[in-house]
Protein backbone atom coordinates (compact mmCIF):
# COMPACT_ATOMS: atom_id res chain seq x y z
CA UNK A 1 0.00 0.00 0.00
CA UNK A 2 1.48 3.36 -1.01
CA UNK A 3 1.21 6.39 1.21
CA UNK A 4 -0.13 9.86 0.53
CA UNK A 5 1.73 13.02 1.50
CA UNK A 6 -0.87 13.61 4.22
CA UNK A 7 -0.13 10.24 5.79
CA UNK A 8 3.61 10.89 5.60
CA UNK A 9 3.19 14.29 7.23
CA UNK A 10 1.09 12.73 9.99
CA UNK A 11 3.84 10.17 10.63
CA UNK A 12 6.51 12.89 10.73
CA UNK A 13 4.33 14.78 13.22
CA UNK A 14 4.11 11.62 15.34
CA UNK A 15 7.91 11.36 15.29
CA UNK A 16 8.21 15.03 16.29
CA UNK A 17 5.74 14.59 19.15
CA UNK A 18 7.44 11.43 20.40
CA UNK A 19 11.03 12.50 19.93
CA UNK A 20 10.65 16.16 20.73
CA UNK A 21 9.07 15.50 24.10
CA UNK A 22 11.61 12.93 25.35
CA UNK A 23 14.26 15.44 26.51
CA UNK A 24 11.54 17.53 28.14
CA UNK A 25 10.15 14.50 29.99
CA UNK A 26 13.64 13.51 31.08
CA UNK A 27 14.36 16.99 32.41
CA UNK A 28 10.99 17.34 34.16
CA UNK A 29 11.23 13.94 35.84
CA UNK A 30 14.67 14.54 37.32
CA UNK A 31 14.51 14.38 41.08
CA UNK A 32 11.88 11.66 41.02
CA UNK A 33 14.38 9.26 42.58
CA UNK A 34 14.18 11.40 45.74
CA UNK A 35 10.63 10.17 46.40
CA UNK A 36 10.92 7.42 49.02
CA UNK A 37 8.09 5.39 50.52
CA UNK A 38 8.03 2.19 52.58
CA UNK A 39 6.00 0.03 50.22
CA UNK A 40 6.08 -0.26 46.45
CA UNK A 41 2.40 0.69 46.20
CA UNK A 42 2.86 3.95 48.13
CA UNK A 43 6.06 4.58 46.17
CA UNK A 44 4.16 4.25 42.91
CA UNK A 45 1.34 6.52 44.06
CA UNK A 46 3.77 9.19 45.27
CA UNK A 47 5.71 9.07 42.00
CA UNK A 48 2.51 9.43 39.99
CA UNK A 49 1.45 12.33 42.21
CA UNK A 50 4.84 13.99 41.81
CA UNK A 51 4.83 13.63 38.03
CA UNK A 52 1.25 14.60 37.29
CA UNK A 53 1.35 17.48 39.74
CA UNK A 54 4.24 18.94 37.77
CA UNK A 55 3.10 20.93 34.71
CA UNK A 56 6.64 20.84 33.30
CA UNK A 57 6.14 17.07 33.05
CA UNK A 58 2.43 16.98 32.29
CA UNK A 59 2.48 19.15 29.16
CA UNK A 60 5.17 17.14 27.30
CA UNK A 61 3.51 13.93 28.50
CA UNK A 62 0.17 14.97 26.99
CA UNK A 63 1.87 15.98 23.73
CA UNK A 64 3.68 12.63 23.65
CA UNK A 65 0.41 10.78 24.20
CA UNK A 66 -1.31 12.80 21.48
CA UNK A 67 1.45 11.53 19.19
CA UNK A 68 0.51 7.99 20.17
CA UNK A 69 -3.14 8.68 19.40
CA UNK A 70 -2.25 10.16 16.01
CA UNK A 71 -0.05 7.12 15.30
CA UNK A 72 -2.92 4.78 16.13
CA UNK A 73 -5.31 6.71 13.88
CA UNK A 74 -2.80 6.92 11.04
CA UNK A 75 -2.05 3.19 11.14
CA UNK A 76 -5.61 2.48 10.00
CA UNK A 77 -4.74 3.76 6.52
CA UNK A 78 -0.93 3.52 6.31
CA UNK A 79 1.37 0.64 5.54
CA UNK A 80 3.11 -0.57 8.69
CA UNK A 81 6.37 -1.04 6.79
CA UNK A 82 6.40 2.71 6.18
CA UNK A 83 4.97 3.90 9.50
CA UNK A 84 7.43 2.14 11.79
CA UNK A 85 10.66 3.32 10.12
CA UNK A 86 9.45 6.90 9.76
CA UNK A 87 8.19 7.24 13.32
CA UNK A 88 10.92 5.37 15.16
CA UNK A 89 13.89 6.65 13.16
CA UNK A 90 12.80 10.25 13.02
CA UNK A 91 11.81 10.22 16.70
CA UNK A 92 15.47 9.60 17.52
CA UNK A 93 16.50 12.48 15.27
CA UNK A 94 13.98 14.82 16.92
CA UNK A 95 15.18 13.69 20.36
CA UNK A 96 18.75 14.59 19.46
CA UNK A 97 17.79 17.96 17.99
CA UNK A 98 15.63 19.02 20.95
CA UNK A 99 18.26 17.69 23.36
CA UNK A 100 20.88 19.83 21.64
CA UNK A 101 18.62 22.90 21.81
CA UNK A 102 18.20 22.26 25.55
CA UNK A 103 21.97 22.10 25.99
CA UNK A 104 22.43 18.35 26.28
CA UNK A 105 25.54 16.66 24.94
CA UNK A 106 24.27 14.62 22.00
CA UNK A 107 27.64 13.49 20.76
CA UNK A 108 29.95 14.84 18.12
CA UNK A 109 30.25 14.50 14.40
CA UNK A 110 29.20 10.86 14.55
CA UNK A 111 25.78 11.84 15.91
CA UNK A 112 25.33 14.42 13.17
CA UNK A 113 26.42 11.90 10.53
CA UNK A 114 23.95 9.40 11.97
CA UNK A 115 21.12 11.93 11.77
CA UNK A 116 22.00 12.79 8.16
CA UNK A 117 22.10 9.12 7.17
CA UNK A 118 18.82 8.45 8.98
CA UNK A 119 17.08 11.36 7.29
CA UNK A 120 18.50 10.32 3.91
CA UNK A 121 17.24 6.76 4.33
CA UNK A 122 13.80 7.88 5.44
CA UNK A 123 13.63 10.33 2.52
CA UNK A 124 14.35 7.49 0.08
CA UNK A 125 11.71 5.34 1.79
CA UNK A 126 9.11 8.13 1.67
CA UNK A 127 9.88 9.13 -1.91
CA UNK A 128 9.61 5.54 -3.06
CA UNK A 129 6.29 5.02 -1.32
CA UNK A 130 4.68 8.32 -2.28
CA UNK A 131 5.82 8.11 -5.90
CA UNK A 132 3.80 4.90 -6.21
CA UNK A 133 0.62 6.90 -5.57
CA UNK A 134 1.37 9.52 -8.23
CA UNK A 135 -0.67 8.90 -11.34
CA UNK A 136 -2.72 6.06 -9.85
CA UNK A 137 -6.49 6.44 -9.91
CA UNK A 138 -8.21 6.62 -6.55
CA UNK A 139 -10.27 3.56 -5.58
CA UNK A 140 -12.60 5.31 -3.15
Curated annotation (Swiss-Prot):
The keyword Secreted is annotated on this UniProt entry: no
UniProt-annotated location(s): Membrane
Domain of life of the native organism: Eukaryota
GO CC annotations, alphabetized: membrane
Primary subcellular site in the record, as a coarse category: membrane
Cited Pfam families: TMEM234
Bilayer-crossing regions: 1-21, 82-102, 111-131
Name of this chain's protein: Transmembrane protein 234
